[in-house]
Each structure stands twice: as C-alpha cells, then as structure tokens.
Amino acid sequence: MKNYHAPDEKGFFGEHGGLFVSETLIPALQELADAYKAAKNDPEFWEAFRHDLKHYVGRPSPVYHAARLSEHLGGAQIWLKREDLNHTGAHKVNNTIGQALLAKRMGKKRVIAETGAGQHGVASATVAARFGMTCDVYMGADDIQRQMPNVFRMKLLGANVVGVESGSRTLKDAMNEAMREWVARVDDTFYIIGTAAGPAPYPEMVRDFQCVIGNEAKAQMQEAIGRQPDVAVACVGGGSNAIGLFHPYIGEENVRLVGVEAGGLGVNTPDHAAPITSGAPIGVLHGFRSYLMQDENGQVLGTHSVSAGLDYPGIGPEHSHLHDIKRVEYTVAKDDEALEAFDLLCRFEGIIPALESSHAVAWAVKNAPKMGKDQVILVNLSGRGDKDINTVAKLKGIKL
C-alpha cells in the first residue's frame, strides 16, 4: 500500500466515487474543484486552516489511555483519540473550517449544509458565524425530533434550520433537498457537505481536511508508546472521521484498520445501516457511486441506527475502495452493543461518548479481551454524547 494514490483525476477511487449529477450542477462542481486545486497548492490557505484549528478548534486533540476500561476488559490497551474535545464537540468542525475558508476564498456569502445528528449542522452554523456568512441547514423532520438540543444550538448560532418532510425524513432526504437548493442558488451559495461522500471533489476534500486526525494520532502514539497501535478503529456512516484516521495509516501495513458500520437490530434484519457488511450492491446516490443499500429495483432502502449520524444507506467512495483492495476491514456493532459501550466508557473513564463513536468503542470492548495486554487499540472517539442523552434516557425508560 506504499504507493496508494486516490482519487484519479475524474474523482474515482477504483470504481467508486465520480460525478453523477444533473447538468445544472456541473459548472458549480467544476468551479469548486478548480478553487480547491488552487487552494491545495497555496501555503497561505493551509496556514489559515492550521491557525483556526489551533486557536479556534483547540487542536491538537489529545490521545488518552483508557487504563481503567482496558483493565476491566482484560486484554489490549485501549487508547482514545479525543475528537470529542474539539470546539463544537466532534470531528465535524475540522472539515467545516476548511470548507468555510474555501467558500470565503471563492467569494460566497452564504453556506448551506445537510445534517443528520445535527453535529455537522452545528459545525456549519459555527463557522458561518465565525466568518460572517448566512447559513441554512437542511435536516430531516425525524432527525429534528431526535436532536432538539442541536437544532436549538444551530438557531442560537444564527442559522436557519429547514425541516425536510419528504421521503424517510432523515439525512438522505436532507441531502437531496440541500443539493436542490444549491442548484437554484449556486452563484452566491457554497454547499458544505459534512461527510466523505457526495460528488467529486467532496470526498477528497473532506478527507484532506479530516486527515489532521490521523496525522496527529501518528505523532502522538509514537511519543506516548514509542510505536504505532496494532489496530486503529473508527465508526463509519458516510465515513469522514474514519477516513481522517485511516488515510495517514494506509501505508503503515502493520497497523490493522477497522471501520465499524451501524448494525442496528442486526444485518440479517432490514433495520441497519451497514452497506458493506450486509453485502449491498453498487449504486448511485447524492452524486457518487458506492456500495448502497437498495432493493432489486435499485430503490434506496430505509435504514436504522440508534445513532442519527450513522443512519445513512450509502458509504463514502474511498471506504468502498479500501474495502475492495482489502486494506480496511469493515464490520458492525449493533444498537445494543453500542449502548453497552456507551455505558462502559461513562462508568470507567468519565467520558460520555457520542452514540456514533460508541460503535467504535464497542469493537474495542468486544475485541480487546481476545488480544494480548501488550497490544494497543486506538479508537477514534469522534464526538461527545451530550446530544444523545435524551435518546439514551428514552431507551432506558427514564423521563428527563
């Protein structure tokens, strides 16, 4: 994997990715691709990016040895990359800072975004306030009900939250609506996509902004334990936190990479969001080609996960490619496993993780006991769980 290079000039990662959009969007995406290419080669752009990551987001985020949890499980040592400590409480802001700087460079006055759990919506509203832009966030009506605290946060930050009533009223539908809006107002509007998916150049761009996670982790693990972890694990919905951790490790062949999809009620039921693990065929959604949960007529299937942020029927194209070339292993954690991991991290480490991140913790909980005490698992703790306490309380039958 030393010579891993993706995507190609057409935005493909192997057979995944690309640009599958209506004619009306082609000029906007071309303008974006050109602007990003120029920014990518401009040291001043990265200087501004690093400045905001340090002084505004509070990076670098630390790596932390979850010693009590490791001892309780008996086996591998579990370390956490603490993305939950970023401003706004998740990894999402790494990407929104980058895209907002690009929007500013392109002279756009308005940003729009889609959101599932509300984390990307909050991160987009945050950077819009930071850079003086107006912001509209598209959110499925069902997700609005699940994530009221984040909806209020976005409004506090000055954003307009647009409820999407069509389809399954979740992330997929919010993304459809945001893309429609972008077509209508492409002149003054920049669309901040929140995950490593969508039409080219988004998957590459989001990955590049999120790679700060893996780049920091490599240096930090070297300093902390004198070597790299045996396994690096992250949850995968669209997959931006995971690609940010994995990409810098692709060339490190002795580091096993594990992506954890949302197993929901089980991949043998219709209620999950695990396109790779469930063996979903390739399809096109939201402007890119990738593994996609669909029926025999190519209709996109409904999904289910206890975490709104993993509740997506597709997966970022680079993840599909990394699965194809067997560099990353993809597996699932079910709702109940994620909830158990959530409880364990709260009780043993005093850290309330996001339900999304709890899926990655669940893999460590399950696998650490099978490994040696001298082995190390690095978990990307992609976000904090304040936004999920209502969901968890409801599942436990507790009224807040």
Curated annotation (Swiss-Prot):
UniProt-listed Enzyme Commission number(s): 4.2.1.20
Q: Which branch of life, at top level?
A: Bacteria
| GO CC term, one of those recorded | cytoplasm
Residues annotated as transmembrane: none
* The protein's required cofactors: pyridoxal 5'-phosphate
Report the enzyme's class at the first EC level: lyase
Q: What does this protein do?
A: The beta subunit is responsible for the synthesis of L-tryptophan from indole and L-serine.
HAMAP family with a match to the protein in the record: Trp_synth_beta
Protein name, UniProt field: Tryptophan synthase beta chain
Organism of this sequence: Neisseria meningitidis serogroup C / serotype 2a (strain ATCC 700532 / DSM 15464 / FAM18)
Q: Which gene does this sequence derive from? A: trpB
